[in-house]
Amino acid sequence: GYVNNRRSNLPYGETDGTWKSHGGFSKVGTCSLPGYSGKVFEPNDEYKGDFARIYFYMATCYEDKIASWSSDMLSHNSYPAYKQWVIDMLLRWAKNDPVSKKEIDRNNAVQRVQGNRNPFVDYPGLEQYIWGNKTDVAFSYDNYDSTIPDPTPDPKPDPNPDPNPDPTPDPNPDPTPTPEPSEGEQVYTLVA
């Protein structure tokens, strides 16, 4: 829509904003972070963590290609892939905007269609083991330290849980229908 049009292909960043969306939730302006002084797009706080986790996932999925991409956010190498000001910003965004139900639902829908998942949604804080303050700690499920509080314990836990339970089938396995394309729009089909 309109806000995405205003973003154009600007890098994400933080700004006081010379342009602000209705309500001031998203902004465009000169970057206020040390390390970059160009024009940036700052998304609504509600979505900053979403973008951070998407960008972390993109860097891991396309590690063999990202060095050749062009963006003011990128360091033109496969690791760390992003410039330090971007890493610091994305780590902060991921911490300050925890994984939401909307992200979990999107991750589940993507898995149904594409067969893959974003591990940064499934394991909040995983980015700390790759770019943050836990890079000297080998990630494993045993030492994984989630930034999300544990859910309320089951008042009647199963005394003999199945170590390999079958996943619960999705009650609504059909993906959301897609609207018909407008004239001139291209249609792409995802192949699993």
For every predicted segment, state its role.
Residues 179-192:
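Secondary-structure capping and domain/repeat boundary segments
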Residues 1-150:
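Domain-level detector of nuclease and nuclease-like folds
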Residues 150, 154, 158, 162, ...:
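Asp/Glu-rich intrinsically disordered low-complexity tracts
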